[in-house]
Amino acid sequence: MKTLFADLRCVAAALLVLVATTLAATGADTQNGADAAARTVLITGANRGIGLELAREYAAAGWHVIGTARKPDEATDLRALGAEVVQLDVTDQASVDGLARALGDRPIDMLINNAGIQLLMWKLEDVDIDRFDRMLAVNTVGPVRVTRALLPNLRAGHRKLIVNVTSDISSIANNTSGGFYGYRESKAALNMFTKSLADELGPEGFICIVLHPGWVRTDMGGPKAPITVQESVHGILKVVDGLSSDDNGTFLTYAGERMAW
């Protein structure tokens, strides 16, 4: 009988150690943003540059990644990550509606509106209205379309996080050089949309921010940009992982700094 009790005590002790270890591991995963099994992130413009690297990092952390591309057949790198690749043109309402139908009622924990374009116009005389309109359509109206269409999915999600990728040159307070016609305006309007969104959805537990990724060495940023895609995305992940309700409606950089509107 004594031997039986001793054996039972050993089993009980082993079970306690196992439970404690499992809880500790789960806590660590959650802290690191993994808590992966039920987490889904949707990234627009995920076939290259910052969007592709974000997809790579979140997939590696165990998240289910939904990456959009205008031409999904060409998104081979994105598909190789194990991401779910979906066709999306953010300027086409029918395409956005198609995305919403494809998702159905699936919860989305985080939406990253990353798709964007920059068509350089330095002086007023150089402004081409069609190019100006194009930047507004992609950089401003596009995120509005996508966020509105996916709001039911985001409401069903756990994290309820909306990250709109902006630029430091969208800051009105810091504009001391002019230029970048169309691009500045499109991103400044995105900032205002995000601030209004934060005020509306904050009471529901949402965190809505705009985030400047830095001047990054991508097709858009060019070869002279000082920041690699990996450096930018590592910073973004750290910022996003540390967000709290106090950050709702803020303008942040990839380094975690707050910017003036």
Where are the regions a protein language model picked out?
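Rossmann-fold scaffold of SDR-type NAD(P)-dependent oxidoreductases
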Residues: 44, 108-116, 139, 164, ...
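Conserved glycine-rich Rossmann-like NAD(P)H-binding loop of the short-chain dehydrogenase/reductase
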Residues: 61-76
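A short helix-coil junction within the Rossmann-fold of NAD(P)-dependent oxidoreductases
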Residues: 57, 61, 105-106, 118-122, ...
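N-terminal Rossmann NAD(P)H-binding glycine-rich loop of SDR-like oxidoreductase domains
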Residues: 47, 51-56
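C-terminal helical subdomain
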Residues: 203, 210-213, 222-261
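Conserved Rossmann-fold cofactor-binding substructure of NAD(P)-dependent oxidoreductases
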Residues: 91-106
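Rossmann-fold cofactor-recognition segment
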Residues: 80-94
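Catalytic loop of short-chain dehydrogenase/reductase
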Residues: 117, 125-136, 141-144, 155-202
